[in-house]
């Protein structure tokens, strides 16, 4: 049997079931086995590994994962795909498809039911563009015990995850993801290898979870509030953004100026020029003056 991720097999499956693509669910099926193999290779899935997939579609990536992993768990929100997955994944007894929205699912419960304690597990997925960021944050903030993520996403989002200070792509998303993970751009994927063809190119991004966050902060929630406030209006200075947008902090420019100067940060700088280490230093200094 041909792999699912070929133009002809994908076309046959879609036509057999009269499947119509839902734009609202970001459904674009990959039809290039080489790209799928690059994804699975970079996930370093072995015979004892587990994999969590989100949005399996008709099972193209799921199939490649099932060939290598001990166990694959796939979350699929679209009920119309369940009978298709039953057929396409029938040769693989190590796959469980869960008909749930991963954003609403109790992922810890699923994890403990489906995987062995201490098992090496990776999240490997071609993520729907419209919910890429919420999915990553849910799994990171809930501290799911996975080794990391190898995910396909809109190239523009991938560029933001990997961005360095001083670039136009660098922002609060870059800092939040890099706080938890080491980010690597594996490859750019052209729009031409999808059916239907999306309007933008994609990127495969590998995120390996850090044993502990890259910087030490006194108050994690406040740290991210400082970061978000600093990027609220990109053209404004750090001083203006923090004085106007940092909730729970005195509206006192003199105090802000003093703290920024004390930690060696020019109040006239813009948020996009600060490294994650500088944000940690700033947050740890500001938190001492936070309103209770």
From Swiss-Prot:
Reaction catalysed by this enzyme: adenosine(1518)/adenosine(1519) in 16S rRNA + 4 S-adenosyl-L-methionine = N(6)-dimethyladenosine(1518)/N(6)-dimethyladenosine(1519) in 16S rRNA + 4 S-adenosyl-L-homocysteine + 4 H(+)
Name the InterPro entries on file. KsgA/Erm (IPR001737), rRNA_Ade_diMease-like_C (IPR023165), rRNA_Ade_Mease_Trfase_CS (IPR020596), rRNA_Ade_methylase_Trfase_N (IPR020598), rRNA_adenine_dimethylase (IPR011530), SAM-dependent_MTases_sf (IPR029063)
Q: What is its main location?
A: cytoplasm
EC number(s) reported in the record: 2.1.1.182
User: What PROSITE patterns does the record tag this protein with?
Assistant: RRNA_A_DIMETH, SAM_RNA_A_N6_MT
Classify the source by domain of life: Bacteria
Pfam families recorded = RrnaAD (PF00398)
Keyword list, A-Z = Cytoplasm, Methyltransferase, RNA-binding, rRNA processing, S-adenosyl-L-methionine, Transferase
For S-adenosyl-L-methionine, which residues are the binding ones?
28, 30, 55, 76, 101, 126
User: A Gene Ontology CC term for this entry?
Assistant: cytosol
What is this protein for, i.e. what is its function?
Specifically dimethylates two adjacent adenosines (A1518 and A1519) in the loop of a conserved hairpin near the 3'-end of 16S rRNA in the 30S particle. May play a critical role in biogenesis of 30S subunits.
Family, similarity comment: Belongs to the class I-like SAM-binding methyltransferase superfamily. rRNA adenine N(6)-methyltransferase family. RsmA subfamily.
What protein name is recorded for this chain?
A: Ribosomal RNA small subunit methyltransferase A
Q: Which organism is it from?
A: Bacillus thuringiensis (strain Al Hakam)
């Amino acid at each position: 049997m041909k792999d699912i991720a070929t133009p002809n097999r994908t076309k046959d499956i879609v036509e057999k079931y009269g499947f119509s693509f839902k734009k609202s669910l970001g459904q674009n099926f990959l039809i290039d086995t080489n790209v799928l193999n690059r994804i699975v290779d970079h996930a370093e899935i072995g015979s004892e590994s587990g994999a969590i997939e989100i949005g399996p579609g008709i099972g193209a990536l799921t199939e490649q994962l099932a060939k290598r992993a001990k166990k694959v768990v796939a979350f699929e929100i679209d009920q119309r795909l369940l009978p298709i997955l039953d057929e396409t994944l029938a040769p693989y007894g190590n796959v469980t498809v869960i008909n749930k929205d991963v954003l609403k699912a109790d992922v810890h419960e699923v994890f403990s039911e489906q995987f062995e304690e201490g098992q090496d597990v990776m999240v490997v997925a071609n993520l729907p563009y419209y919910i890429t960021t919420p999915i990553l944050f849910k799994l990171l903030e809930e501290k799911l015990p996975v080794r990391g993520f190898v995910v396909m996403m809109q190239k523009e989002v991938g560029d933001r995850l990997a961005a360095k200070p001083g670039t136009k792509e660098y922002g609060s998303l870059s800092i939040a993801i890099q706080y938890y993970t080491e980010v690597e751009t594996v490859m750019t994927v052209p729009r031409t290898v999808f059916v239907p063809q999306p309007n933008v190119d994609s990127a495969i991004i590998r995120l390996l979870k850090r044993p502990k966050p890259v910087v030490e902060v006194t108050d994690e929630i406040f740290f991210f509030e400082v970061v978000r406030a600093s990027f609220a209006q990109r053209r404004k200075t750090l001083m203006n953004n923090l004085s106007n947008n940092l909730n729970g902090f005195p509206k006192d420019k003199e105090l802000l100026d003093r703290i920024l100067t004390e930690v060696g940060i020019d109040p006239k700088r813009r948020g996009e020029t600060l490294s994650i280490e500088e944000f940690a230093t700033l947050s740890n200094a500001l938190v001492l003056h936070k309103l209770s």
